[in-house]
Amino acid sequence: MRPSDRRPDLLRPVTLETGVNRYAEGSCLASFGHTKVLVTASLEEGVPPFLRGKGQGWVTAEYGMLPRATHTRGRREAAQGKQSGRTQEIQRLIGRSLRAVVDLKALGERQITVDCDVVQADGGTRTAAITGAWVALRLATRYLLEEGVIATDPILDQVAAISCGVFSGTPVLDLDYEEDSNAEADANFVLTGAGDIVEIQATGEKRGFSEAEFEALFALARKGIGELCELQRAATGG
């Protein structure tokens, strides 16, 4: 039995609330149970130096946790003077995931920066961030199309992410913090709306896990991401 009493194949309650920041070109508050991530997508004219003159844009991401996102207050990374390795890993993952479904040439020499700030953490912050980031990016690119800033829709497909793990010997979908902390194995899956793989991160935490267990986790992920893609479409109006 899961601590939350959910069935093994059941997501936490998920909401993707849009328009939560009046200034950003696109914004979303992604809530997966008690995990809440505020995402904004902002247009910046110009691109990083390595892309100048190449006629294409860029999508990048930044990720951070508010000091009281967890049970005890953590120091702001800015106050420490450097980002943790975890932060750098997660924001690179978010950026890669978004770029996998964007036609960068359609942006011209412009950059969209997607900021993902964890307001409250109860497991699955990176997967919630990716799922909400696509919503914010979709809204931002639609705004740019409507304003005539770009002429072609750069969004090629949806992308969403979910965690799965082996908990008490059972493959389960969408781990909360208690499950994640006690999982025998866990994995993060990033898939497109078409079902293509963008990234899989899988780790045996307390033991190795079998190919059959991995296939069970992958099947759960496909089911969960299918449901998340439906919620993304509903949040963005199709």
From Swiss-Prot:
Record: residues binding phosphate: R86, G124, T125, R126
Catalytic EC class: transferase
One term of GO molecular function: 3'-5'-RNA exonuclease activity
EC number: 2.7.7.56
InterPro entries per record: ExoRNase_PH_dom1, ExoRNase_PH_dom2, ExoRNase_PH_dom2_sf, PNPase/RNase_PH_dom_sf, Ribosomal_Su5_D2-typ_SF, RNase_PH, RNase_PH_bac-type, RNase_PH_CS
Biological role stated in the UniProt entry: Phosphorolytic 3'-5' exoribonuclease that plays an important role in tRNA 3'-end maturation. Removes nucleotide residues following the 3'-CCA terminus of tRNAs; can also add nucleotides to the ends of RNA molecules by using nucleoside diphosphates as substrates, but this may not be physiologically important. Probably plays a role in initiation of 16S rRNA degradation (leading to ribosome degradation) during starvation.
Entry similarity comment: Belongs to the RNase PH family.
Quaternary data: Homohexameric ring arranged as a trimer of dimers.
Official protein name in the record: Ribonuclease PH
Gene behind the chain: rph
